[in-house]
């Protein structure tokens, strides 16, 4: 759980910072496919036709919402480090959700501690390695007063999100958790529209409908 949580955060955030966000998110949200396979191996959960239908609907919705204006040529760009990191992040996130469910007999405090330790440990190791290699600059501690409120706010948001995730993931089948998590794509798109960073077009409506249908099927299975 420590390794899975830490790798998820480090890989996904690194990928977003260096790659095309649309492409990274789309590759990351292949996560339900990994979840179905890992759940079969680690939890002996059956792969039912309904589970496959929910995964297909969710991925179709994500593809429609995230399809770039440039068309298929943008999705077919050369495979990059960001692409690899996005795939690693999605696989690790699926493994994280399954491990949370597998360790559901442990206290929520223990699971939360493992996730936070993993996030800090793996991200710290990656940061130190990249700084030593000269790929990223050292933090500007003299200007800490300018960025620490934002850092504190983000930390609080991550805390709330992780607590909600482990509460739900420990009580739901892994494949259902994976598909429900796809609603993040819809929420992100809607937030962009509300903040004036996007428009409410046919693609968003159609893709959002697919994602909501997938989540609805998961909730009522």
Question: Across the structure, where does each feature detected by a protein language model lie?
Answer:
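Specific transmembrane alpha-helical segments of multi-pass solute transporters/efflux pumps
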Residues: 1-23, 64, 156-172
């Amino acid at each position: 759980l420590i390794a899975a949580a830490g790798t998820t955060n480090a890989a996904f955030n690194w990928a977003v910072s260096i790659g095309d966000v649309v492409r990274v998110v789309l590759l990351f949200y292949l996560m339900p496919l990994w979840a179905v396979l890992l759940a079969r191996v680690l939890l002996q959960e059956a792969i039912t036709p309904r589970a496959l239908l929910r995964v297909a609907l969710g991925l179709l919705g994500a593809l429609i919402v995230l399809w770039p204006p440039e068309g298929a040529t943008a999705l077919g760009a050369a495979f990059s480090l960001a692409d690899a990191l996005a795939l690693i992040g999605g696989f690790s996130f699926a493994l994280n959700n399954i491990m949370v469910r597998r360790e559901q007999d442990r206290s929520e405090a223990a699971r939360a501690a493992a996730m936070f330790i993993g996030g800090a440990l793996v991200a710290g190791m990656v940061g130190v390695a990249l700084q030593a290699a000269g790929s990223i600059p050292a933090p500007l501690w003299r200007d800490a007063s300018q960025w620490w409120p934002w850092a504190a706010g983000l930390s609080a948001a991550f805390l709330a999100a992780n607590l909600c995730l482990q509460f739900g993931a420990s009580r739901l089948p892994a494949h259902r958790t994976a598909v429900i998590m796809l609603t993040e794509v819809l929420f992100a798109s809607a937030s962009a529209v509300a903040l004036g960073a996007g428009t409410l077009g046919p693609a968003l409506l159609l893709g959002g409908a697919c994602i909501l249908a997938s989540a609805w099927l998961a909730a009522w299975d």
